[in-house]
């Protein structure tokens, strides 16, 4: 039994039923009493009673909390929600579609949250959540049944590859890992668009993650004695791992190798290298996601689905050498 079914049974709109549980003064006491009485008869009063905790609770499902990219997103969400007088609760999905679906069901059905945000959604379930839900970066078919906010990494990566080409680079490599195949696809598209040869010898998909992926990935290229002049890394931690390897070999960026990262994390600016990177515009995607979610929480009858794409952008710094000046 959910609020929509209670709405049908009592004859009141879904918005009115929701207001009865939130303690709203916008409906009469008589109307509220009828709805609450029926809810108690049906055994769902405790499930939906929100008066025990007046602040709005937003459940955020996140693949992990080790990555700076995800912690940046969570930090923005916490900041914005605090400013709006709301509370965030975070659950980790471990990149698992089944775990994600279980958490959606948990928060949706037990009244523990008013709305849900799913970061990098993996679940392909077509079921509607019983409470408002927004996907932040989702699979292609998700927009058919849920609001989706997606980052277009293709745009920023295309800008990055164009920057490398304009600076005379033809031998461009890629280092990523199994969880970054979307960026690998974007890299391939960008290389093809600019008519640049993709050398399989310059592509590494590492089993390791973070700095280890960059260090071990570039070591594999180094051992082949046939290096590219530039490397695009799926995220900045990978780029930092490449830099660590180069420093051990007493090589410098960009003199000996040009590097571009992705996600534009703050930690990259603390290193000696002023790393060029792809910015995901985290602030924008968080603000848009919450705007849509809070609107639907406050107005349950609002059913319009939105599919918003936010472009990434290439942030040029000083980690690319201009080969045209040689």
Regions inferred by a protein language model and the residue ranges of each:
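N-terminal helix-turn-helix DNA-binding module of bacterial transcription factors
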Residues: 1-54
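Short beta-strand segments enriched in small/hydrophobic residues
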Residues: 16, 51-66, 163, 171-177
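Alpha-helical recognition/docking segments in bacterial nutrient-uptake
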Residues: 55-162, 222-223
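Short, solvent-exposed amphipathic alpha-helices that sit
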Residues: 69-83, 156-159, 179-197, 213, ...
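Short beta-strand elements in bilobed, periplasmic/extracellular small-molecule ligand-binding domains
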Residues: 81-93, 173, 188-212
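Hydrophobic alpha-helical segments within soluble ligand-binding/sensing domains
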Residues: 147-174, 211-220, 239, 280-298
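An alpha-beta-alpha
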Residues: 160-195, 201, 302-320
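Flexible loop/turn connectors
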Residues: 219-326
